[in-house]
Amino acid sequence: WEIDPATRKVKAKITVGREPVAMASFAGDSCLLIANNMPEMPSTAYPLAAQLDIVDVSSKKVASRIMLPNGSTDVKSIAVDKNRAYAYVTHLIARYQLPTNQLDRGWMATNTLSIIDLKARKLLTSVLLDTPQKGAANPWSVIVTPDDKQIIVAAAGSQELVRIDRIALHERLAKAKQGVMVTPSVKSWNNIPNDAGFLYGIRDFIPTQGKGPRSVVATGNKIYTANYYTSELVSMDMNGKNLNKQVLGAPLAFTKVGKGDMYFHDATICFQNWQSCATCHPNDARMDGLNWDLLNDGMGNPKNTKTLLLSHQTPPCMATGI
């Protein structure tokens, strides 16, 4: 919606994709990049992924669309650099075409940062926030620090911040584009979205010492994040050191409902922090728009993820009657 701040009235409504959740301006504020949370095509389509919309502000119409990699869902946040040359988008890449028989190395889901070339208006590539042995589950907010040197992602499921050397990232991408084997695991440019080793050496993890870091900001020489479930404001220096916490009110986790919601979104109780319940059932335990082949009714019959809303009162939960 375009709202006139003087009259507080809606001036225009612009139709975009499914469940828009974030936006950022670029091209001298003449365009908006819109993040749509969910895939909008049928779950039997290919590719099946959430899309970004580029809105022309003057015409108030979608000028073009950018599709994220196949399996992309639960898009959360957008950040841009100072020059507005690149945008960084947090989301999941679900490996929904594989059987759900293991979690190792992101077999079911990987946690992703997609990089958008705003001048070319296309997807540059997507990099995995995970390592081969550890997930950075449920990436939420993303920022670029004021000096443009770091990208910070709040990994809400694994209870940490992911700190990436932005300068080194783009240098590595430029070399990989030329065919240089920038890390031992890099096989080709097109394989980067599947390579959990691509960020090796230029990314670290900063535990927030609480539950549910969903937002992150950086001002001056400080990084701030908020632990949603434990009601804490956390500050640290730009290197992720000298961490301080301040409790703000009664933690949500003190209530029975809040504690259950916390566990639902907590990937630290999962093998190697790869995923939480919210990975497949985001947005208050709803669906992710994908088909999955769960093994409790055999293999080879993928079905659309169901919302969990009232599912305990409406059995059976599987399409085959289980």
Stretch-by-stretch model annotation:
Residues 3-8, 55, 59-61:
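Extracytoplasmic/lumenal domain signature
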Residues 15-17, 26, 35, 55-58, ...:
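A structural detector for beta-sheet-dominated domains
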Residues 25-27, 56-59, 80-86:
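A short, structured loop/turn motif at beta-sheet edges
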Residues 8, 64, 76-102, 109-112, ...:
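Periplasmic c-type cytochrome electron-transfer domains
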Residues 3, 25, 53-55, 158:
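Gly/Ser/Thr-rich loops at beta-strand to alpha-helix junctions
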Residues 10-24, 38-40, 47-50, 62-77:
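Asp-box/WD-like beta-propeller blade repeats and closely related beta-sheet repeat scaffolds
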Residues 5, 19-21, 34-53, 89-102, ...:
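Beta-propeller blade termini and top-face loops
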